[in-house]
């Protein structure tokens, strides 16, 4: 039998998982002066790039922690707060100035950090089965028949694939709200060359000016076509192009990113495509884009969304996040359109950005949206602080109807949380030597809409890496390790970022009411 033995194995090469094993390897070496045996295995082709959806999925526009002006001033913070130290290092080594991450630089930075930490890599892995001793995982058997033994395991996949193989029960889609088929859309990112920021600004402005000018009959025909001949929708789209002061909602270009603020470019594409600009009806949309500005007149677009059910999201994740034929067909139309506007090339990513694919159950301490609004874990336990809105891009299908049916007629928009991070929602109680560090961790209610963000999960991953070493050196399981133990290491090594969680108890109570009310029937069916 081909048997390989390690201390820690991570399945999945999403950035939080990669930084978790680097964190673990460094901590083990600090404590023992020896290199640990750590293995990072992935379904993906690591030769194509290391870093999951940020690299092979081409998601160059990073979602950063968003700290309010008030907190920035009172606590002397920068706009992105105080990121986890290992994330800061990764961004610095990848040459990120604010938002834009060059995939080739990211993979080079991660590879160098992995080599330096002595982490082994394994590509294109399929799990055949899992061996367990009692509740604990003892080894992973791959489809090639090799047995990989370890003491502690980390699952960094969007769908909790290792956890599922180990018998962990997963809530599909938004089953936490009794909506097991509903899922967030997936994105096929693409990169354009030859379309300058200046040219894109001009196009955006021209489209805005024309679509909002009712006397421009040709432009109004295009607008009506994009609205699927629905005059009411055409009017709504027109109104979305103007702000409250009556000014055109032109795109915003920062140093290394562009935020498209109106549907003008989307209208232009959808009229060209002959498809109604209505995501709930068609399931495909060129949305208002988040665009990263890369060197050599390259732009990386997070804009093309595809609706998926929870079972489709799961199937895509299991299939290595590869785009479907239908998605490839759509990108060919996007390519034709963008080339007509001046792009010299349009290159789609080799993998999809899957935002969410369910959540595991049976963690040590589940994390809800209400807990985030209340400020997260106590400051004395905190490993970092994160601030981000409850972002369900593309919407959760059926949530409005579900809320009304349960008697909730208040707003579904909740305040942005600024909360302290721990690791206990990522540690499995049911499989005590396993942690799930991804959008699939033990989130309940609205928590996954914030908890799916990479920067947040890196803080969790750094903590889990340290926890895994604590567990190994003290002959314990991951599930036994407290936030305080991990925090102690961060303090000792000068790695603890600023902690500034905000307890918003009023909004926290409101969201707790909503989460409890909407999830009541979901919990009853478990």
Describe the residue ranges of each PLM region:
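Flavin (FAD/FMN)-binding glycine-rich loop and adjacent Rossmann-like elements that form
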Residues: 53, 146, 150, 157-463, ...
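Beta1/beta-strand and adjacent pyrophosphate-binding region of the FAD-binding site
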Residues: 2-16
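Conserved beta-strand elements of the Class I
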Residues: 7-9, 39, 435
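Conserved N-terminal/central alpha/beta ligand/cofactor-binding core
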Residues: 29-129, 180, 184-186
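Mobile, glycine-rich extracellular loop/lid and propeptide segments
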Residues: 15-21, 51, 114, 126-128, ...
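Conserved beta-strand-loop-beta-strand element in the redox core of flavoprotein oxidoreductases
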Residues: 131-147
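A short, Lys/Arg-enriched amphipathic alpha-helix followed by its capping loop at the start of a domain
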Residues: 20-36, 152
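Soluble non-cytosolic domains of exported or imported proteins
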Residues: 14-15, 100-105, 455, 480
